């Protein structure tokens, strides 16, 4: 039996990914469980889900504390969450990241697989919902379930065009997954943010082109989080509280605000 833990954020489809993975295993005549763990989280809040897959039926239904694999749908979660907690010594991390495995910093020599699931999802689906893309990476990196089985589960979940688009995301991620060994470090860097910070919730980050900003305050007026300030007549974003909703960029009449993928600005 193998045990898998998935980390994501509300709206990225971590719970659906666990169900799709369990369904794919079932299509291969294996026993499987999908176990979500979430409460009243809003979009952007951390979510965890679990999957068990085996050749024999297991009566245990508990949460998984020592997984064989950890799958991470959001590239920024590893800054604030201990994604390797309980991971077995010979375990593997499957990460949504645009950087190669050799540049991923970890405390232990786990195997690492990376894929730029965010960009793949944006290209195929038009939205940063990374659950199906990351399953393609899981197939390629682990071989625990077959690509055809995952695609079958996807098309069963979403018949028609949406299923075809998600199947394309699975296939493209499968072809663009890289597996390797991480860079071992002695101490993991952690981001310390204000208690009420929601900075790690966002996928996109607004950036201000000061040369274009006219100080019209449209972004300041429409920002739902009140995290834009006017400094010397120009817009300044307080990134500790920005959730990356993109309203500021939509409302800016001169194109001074633009949205960039957060992980690309950090990595």
Question: Model regions: which residues?
Answer:
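Active-site cofactor/cluster-binding pocket
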Residues: 1-200, 211-214, 265-267
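Iron-sulfur cluster-binding cysteine motifs and their immediate structural context
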Residues: 208, 218-236, 247-264
């Amino acid at each position: 039996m193998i045990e898998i833990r998935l980390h994501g954020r509300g709206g990225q489809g971590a719970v659906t990914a666990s169900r799709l993975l369990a369904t794919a295993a079932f299509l291969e005549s294996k026993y499987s469980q999908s176990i979500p763990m979430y409460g009243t989280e809003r979009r952007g809040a951390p979510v965890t889900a679990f999957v068990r897959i085996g050749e024999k039926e297991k009566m245990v239904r508990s949460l998984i504390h020592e997984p064989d694999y950890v799958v991470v749908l959001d590239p920024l979660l590893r800054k604030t969450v201990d994604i390797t907690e309980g991971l077995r010594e010979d375990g593997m991390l499957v990460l949504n990241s645009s950087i190669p495995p050799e540049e991923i910093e970890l405390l232990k020599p786990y195997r690492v697989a990376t894929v730029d699931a965010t960009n793949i999802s944006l290209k195929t689906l038009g939205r940063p919902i990374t659950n199906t893309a990351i399953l393609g990476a899981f197939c390629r990196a682990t071989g625990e379930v077959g690509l055809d089985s995952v695609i079958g589960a996807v098309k069963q979940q979403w018949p028609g065009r949406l299923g075809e688009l998600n199947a394309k995301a699975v296939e493209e991620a499968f072809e663009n997954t890289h597996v390797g060994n991480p860079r071992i470090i002695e101490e993991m860097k952690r981001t310390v943010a204000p208690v009420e910070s929601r900075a790690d919730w966002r996928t996109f980050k607004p950036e201000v082109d000061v040369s274009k900003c006219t100080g019209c305050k449209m972004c300041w007026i429409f920002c739902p989080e009140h995290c834009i300030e006017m400094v010397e007549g120009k817009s300044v974003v307080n990134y500790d509280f920005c959730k990356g909703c993109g309203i500021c960029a939509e409302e800016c009449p001169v194109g001074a605000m633009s949205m960039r993928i957060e992980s690309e600005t950090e990595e």
